[in-house]
Amino acid sequence: AQITGEESLTCGHCIAICPKDAISLKNSEFEKIDFATFTYENKWIKQGKFETSELVRLMLSRRSCRNFKDKNVDKEILEELIKIGTTAPSGSNCQDWIFTVVPTKKDVAIFGKKIGEFFKKLNRMSNNIVLRKGMTLFGNKKLEFYWENYYESVKETIELYENKGVDKLFHGASAVIMVGGLKESSCPSEDALLAT
């Protein structure tokens, strides 16, 4: 059987669970995604056929990288990382991701400075007890929460950067890919997390 028409969610579930490989999709979204930097087997992994131990091994291999090479990342690699991100699941299969690329070490440094300026302003506001308590009095406890939980660590991070050049935000990364979602999506925060 070939799935066509407007009723399909194009999620691929019917293909994944069919025991006889009897279903195909006409929709081009399920054609092979071409990658220039690596190859992969273009076959669905049948339910129950993926080794749990391999998933556990993958999850245990996860690490935060804070040691980056002092060279820019090829544009092709950044584009392919985004392609991989678009294969992530999303709430209601809406796939409303927004990928923003900061492509060079110089751009990352400029972006980091802008973020630092934002947090310096936020720290000044949260350190103003009249403003903080006034907002709390009118039912907005966000600034008080920020001051209690983040003020000191953000202050230290900003001082480290300004006085010693230590980048605790991007750790000297050569490029950054930020993933966001549209507010009107069914679960934008979760979708963005799954695509990273």
Language-model region placement:
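Iron-sulfur cluster-binding cysteine motifs and their immediate structural context
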Residues: 1-2, 13-31
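Terminal amphipathic helices with adjacent charged low-complexity linkers/tails
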Residues: 21, 31-33, 103-109
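Non-catalytic interaction/regulatory modules that flank or connect domains
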Residues: 80-93, 97-99
